[in-house]
């Protein structure tokens, strides 16, 4: 109602201060008719317009809420993904550390095994050298004895023969 009154007051100066010229105008009647028409439209359509805009506001609010829920769900997923990423990085670091310690222990085991093999090979070499040396000594003694026993021009006593063998062996 206040709007109609304000609209009427706003248009009143136009109607009141209009100069009358040679031509008659019906501006006052047209203004009054327009105000009546606007009031009737307002009376008939105000509830429908208000309902339309209220429903539109509610639908926009519902869409906004839906978008905000989707946004929040997306942010939660991003947060979860970041947590999983951090856990994966920690697990990767632990696996790397574990692998490094495993590598060190394997290196140490291999080094120990190689050292033990080298020691065994050296021991076997020394034993084989002793065996070969004793074989060579036996062979030399056998050759010397055979040579001495086969030659008739050398006549030695048992004691001399033992002394010769001991000298050759030593």
Swiss-Prot record:
Cell location: Cell inner membrane
Keyword Transport: yes
Membrane topology note: Single-pass membrane protein
Function in brief: F(1)F(0) ATP synthase produces ATP from ADP in the presence of a proton or sodium gradient. F-type ATPases consist of two structural domains, F(1) containing the extramembraneous catalytic core and F(0) containing the membrane proton channel, linked together by a central stalk and a peripheral stalk. During catalysis, ATP synthesis in the catalytic domain of F(1) is coupled via a rotary mechanism of the central stalk subunits to proton translocation.
Gene Ontology cellular component annotations, sorted alphabetically: plasma membrane; proton-transporting ATP synthase complex
CDD domains, alphabetized: ATP-synt_Fo_b (cd06503)
Protein family per UniProt: Belongs to the ATPase B chain family.
Keyword vocabulary terms for this entry: ATP synthesis, Cell inner membrane, Cell membrane, CF(0), Hydrogen ion transport, Ion transport, Membrane, Transmembrane, Transmembrane helix, Transport
Bilayer-crossing regions: 4-24
Subunit text: F-type ATPases have 2 components, F(1) - the catalytic core - and F(0) - the membrane proton channel. F(1) has five subunits: alpha(3), beta(3), gamma(1), delta(1), epsilon(1). F(0) has three main subunits: a(1), b(2) and c(10-14). The alpha and beta chains form an alternating ring which encloses part of the gamma chain. F(1) is attached to F(0) by a central stalk formed by the gamma and epsilon chains, while a peripheral stalk is formed by the delta and b chains.
UniProt cross-references to Pfam families, sorted A to Z: ATP-synt_B
Name of this chain's protein: ATP synthase subunit b
GO molecular function: proton-transporting ATP synthase activity, rotational mechanism
Classification via InterPro entries: ATP_synth_b/b'su_bac/chlpt
